[in-house]
């Protein structure tokens, strides 16, 4: 790369929130800057700030594992969380109106996440979908004009995913308790209506449109599959001390899902509702050979809206922003341009100041 342009980028990177390392391999190894996660690799090129995911937690403690939405190892970006005191798993599962003090705690938890810099908010329990509308609109109001997308449950993905399956296909919705999830079908509409009325008193017009959570589990394109019969998983959920070896659980869940898919070959994808089952999505993929979406998928999906486009596009442009990336002039093994014509153009440098 040209030395003048390289120096300019380095000077500007120094003033960014995340320091940049030299881009050549030898210098990068010697660079003392600590790169906390994969996003910092993007920041090396673009000087972008780190994205932050806010996790709204119910009042329930459990041992996190790789693949859980509360485990920092599940993501390559920053994670902050806030617990809604009084919103127990039982209350979340029932979906009944919350006591005033719990609603106040819910407001406080959302504020805490936004104040901590959360770019978007997800939940650690699928039953938080009952409060999807309320939290979505309250967060937007409190954020004061700053976009803060909210997706509290992987169930919000159920309708968009229907567009991806072929005619006659089904999405298997995996949940810890089939009975509890089916009850949601009857309650969700009335709960949403109550939240809309509450939100109107707060002068949040967006609450009139409860988009994204009108879920109909009686739709023949959905097949609700409960993990009630997977004994090792039920034991793990009930064990407050956690589970040290999850391999036996993963194998049992994978075998169970494979059996269900064999009995109903119309299933062509899985959507995991239960947050604690999300850590076994890899086993379900291997066992069934089908794509799997889970609570972690939500976090990664929303994060891309804040991190992906600028670096990948800008790095393919030259000084004027018009020169396309020539594969023959690129070190593919390192995944980064090596020629001077692939520098950031001045218009992009100005954007990153």
From Swiss-Prot:
Q: Which reaction does it catalyse?
A: S,S-dimethyl-beta-propiothetin = acrylate + dimethyl sulfide + H(+)
Provide any one GO MF term from the record. Answer: dimethylpropiothetin dethiomethylase activity
Induction (free text): Expressed at low level.
Record EC number: 4.4.1.3
Domain of life according to the entry? Eukaryota
Tagged with keyword Iron-sulfur: no
Q: Which family is this sequence assigned to? A: Belongs to the aspartate/glutamate racemases family. ALMA1 subfamily.
Q: What is this protein called?
A: Dimethylsulfoniopropionate lyase 2
